[in-house]
């Protein structure tokens, strides 16, 4: 039996365990490789990204591709951490290319090893109602270039609500333009977010320990609710906290960035069938 060798590192950005693959593979294999690596019986993580380039020619060639071609804020922070650990960065501010985002992503390294990522811009923000089970829930629908989020205010995150959300996500026929669908259960009083991310391409549905893009959506939610900017607003999540800075400009729309810390927990080789 031939087994394929995968060179990887595993990172911890606020509990959202992330694997970045260093070895080169055909893009058609990304989903299959990721599904095996993510399994609880394997290396185990919440998402997998593939490093396509660590070269920096004019700041445009750092390139990260996620297994479902989605954008991921925590994986981008993990990629920044990798670039810094490998001494590949010349400046504290730079840009990287990430799947699911047509523009280059502005990044920065701050004191105390905080990494900041400029997040994709919301294209449309509208209040809506979601019918789940026998209940109707008020939500804020936030549509991005390649994904959609629903921020649902809750007083408490319960198992019952989580099951309703899971069923809702699976039952919908999502547009092919959405690489990911996020259901963000948000307790405003505690500033606590419980994020669910669904990736249609690989049929991955995970209650994440933390979510960078979801944190950005909480920033947009705050802007919309309070009609005011927020800076380094702490969003607590099951695996840790992420900071969000967000403001709404009349001409530019919502401008949002997230900031967090990352640690390396493992590096080595994995074997897949």
UniProtKB/Swiss-Prot annotation:
One CC-aspect GO term: cytoplasm
Taxonomic path: Bacteria, Bacillati, Bacillota, Bacilli, Bacillales
Protein name listed in UniProt: Histidine racemase
EC number: 5.1.1.24
Chief location of this protein within or outside the cell: cytoplasm
Effect of residue 72 to S: Loss of activity
Cell compartments where the protein resides: Cytoplasm
Active-site residues, as the UniProt record annotates them: 72, 211
Source organism superkingdom: Bacteria
Family: Belongs to the histidine racemase family.
Species assigned in the record: Staphylococcus aureus (strain Mu50 / ATCC 700699)
